[in-house]
Swiss-Prot record:
The active site is at C92 (proton acceptor), C242 (proton donor). It comes from the Bacteria. It catalyses: trans-4-hydroxy-L-proline = cis-4-hydroxy-D-proline. It is an enzyme of class 5 (isomerase). It comes from Psychrobacter cryohalolentis (strain ATCC BAA-1226 / DSM 17306 / VKM B-2378 / K5). Substrate binds at G93, H94, H212, D238, G243, T244. Catalyzes the epimerization of trans-4-hydroxy-L-proline (t4LHyp) to cis-4-hydroxy-D-proline (c4DHyp). Is likely involved in a degradation pathway that converts t4LHyp to alpha-ketoglutarate. Displays no proline racemase activity. This is 4-hydroxyproline 2-epimerase.
Amino acid sequence: MASSLFNFKIIDSHTGGEPTRMVYDGFPDLVGDTIQDKLQSFKQNFDHLRQSIILEPRGNDVLVGALLLPASHPKATAGVIFFNNAGYLGMCGHGTIGVIVSLAYQQKISAGVHWLETPVGLVKATLHDDGSCSVQNVPSYRYKKQVEVHVPELGLIRGDIAWGGNWFFLVSEHGQDIQASNVKQLTQVTMQIKQALVAANITGENSSEIDHIELFADSDDTQVDSKNFVLCPGSAYDRSPCGTGTSAKLACLAADNKLAPEQLWQQQGVVGSVFTGSYQYASELNTTLKNPAGAAYPEQTIIPTICGHAYVCAETTLIMQEDDPFKWGIPS
């Protein structure tokens, strides 16, 4: 039998139906003093390991990976780099909840406040006694309101461009039925919107790619405020209500004065799971904030908090054997 090149210790969880795979042992050392440096080291030297962890036959296109790292910031419990089948994520709300619950499962943390260091900043997470987890996300804001894009298959579509840890194009008027039974059509429509944004050179701030498309509609459940469908990088859809997407939505609601600070927002995802969101204005927290590029955030920047549940599904070892033709995954 061929020897193993790598053995990765992992814990799989799901948050509102969306899976997270936390890699906590066996990964090669990454070069760099900061987590941003380590992200570059990951990208440049070990992208084949991202593919091996995420892609079939060991993973799937829905899975989000979370590489656990020692923190470089003294305030942080751990560092984490999120990634998926398409590449790397600055931040992942459902993934953060999954990581916190997985660490609790390992008895490495208990109920209380914990900080995770991500490439886009420190993220505050609170593990509650009932097992739920609240994530105080990175500063979030609306960049542009009601941007028009012509989608050949759909006509004129308007949406807000907002940052919630990733870049989103948020669309409320789209004529689609947001139901789990309609996922194929929703995926096609959101991919068409994404392609139209690229063709029109419509981007986030500093020409950043808008890699998430989010559709909203009213829900059949009168206990929730909205239902969404989120297309993620790699063309998979988010089973959860999407933590960074809900943060981006809260930023737009705040900018339009449609949601007051600390007022609760119940965001339902396409499979029916719910995140509870709220926010405070960054200025009210007396915080001097700079984005990862070192520039000041806009005046109406918010600090969102997202609360949800995650559940551990598996604890195992991923093995990459030397003679395995698919040790680096099956290209998607």
